[in-house]
């Protein structure tokens, strides 16, 4: 019985999240009502409240799951406590989950903060050759990657993930970020 209930709960949450991600593309979060959401998800209002306190709780849970997804994407690197410069993995994930990432940007979720806890200063120093202003270089890089991802999503991810890596590398004068 619990397996059936768990499957139902997961399916309900999936419907709610899907409806939310569709609505957030055309509305601001404060304009989305539970009524709109349950109507689009084709579920009962009580089903929503079994899973979430309100729309903001739903958004928070989505953000938390997004962060977990990114951590899982780089699980091996997290275990080794070493930053990964494998942006191809990230761009492939974004292309496969476009509405998810569009939703996160719409909710102002700064998933680039992932780098704050994983970026290795030693690697950045090797790349730049100095510790002078390293914090500024790192912030500039994070903002640049974030802007490129937003632009790519707005354009419908027309370019391949491989082309996006080429664009990033060209911004760094062909230098590989891996050293």
PLM regions with names:
Residues 1-23, 27:
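Basic, helix-initiating cap at the start of DNA-binding domains
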Residues 16, 35-40, 48, 94:
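Append "Primarily bacterial transcriptional regulators
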Residues 22, 26, 32, 62-86:
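Amphipathic alpha-helical linker/stalk segments
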Residues 31, 54-59:
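Short amphipathic alpha-helical segment with a characteristic S/N-K-E followed by hydrophobic residues
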Residues 42-52, 145:
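Short hydrophobic/aromatic patch on the recognition helix
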Residues 79-120:
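Helical hydrophobic small-molecule/effector-binding pocket
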Residues 107-143, 177:
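Amphipathic alpha-helical packing segments from all-alpha helical-bundle domains
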Residues 132-155, 159-174:
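Hydrophobic alpha-helical segments that form the core
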């Amino acid at each position: 019985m619990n397996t059936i209930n768990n499957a139902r709960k997961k399916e309900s949450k999936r419907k709610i999240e899907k409806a939310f991600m569709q609505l957030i593309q055309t509305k601001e979060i404060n304009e989305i009502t539970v009524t709109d959401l349950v109507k689009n998800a084709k579920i009962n209002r009580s089903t929503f409240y079994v899973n979430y306190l309100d729309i903001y709780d739903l958004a928070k849970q989505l953000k938390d799951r997004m962060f977990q997804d990114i951590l899982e994407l780089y699980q091996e690197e997290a275990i080794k406590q070493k930053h990964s410069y494998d942006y191809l993995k990230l761009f492939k994930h974004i292309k496969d989950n476009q509405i998810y990432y569009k939703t996160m940007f719409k909710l102002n979720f700064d998933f680039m903060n992932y780098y704050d806890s994983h970026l290795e200063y030693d690697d950045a120093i090797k790349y730049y050759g100095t510790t002078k202003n390293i914090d500024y270089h790192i912030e500039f890089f994070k903002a640049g990657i974030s802007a490129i991802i937003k632009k790519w999503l707005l354009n419908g991810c027309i370019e391949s993930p491989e082309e996006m890596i080429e664009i990033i590398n060209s911004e760094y004068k062909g230098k590989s970020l891996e050293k």
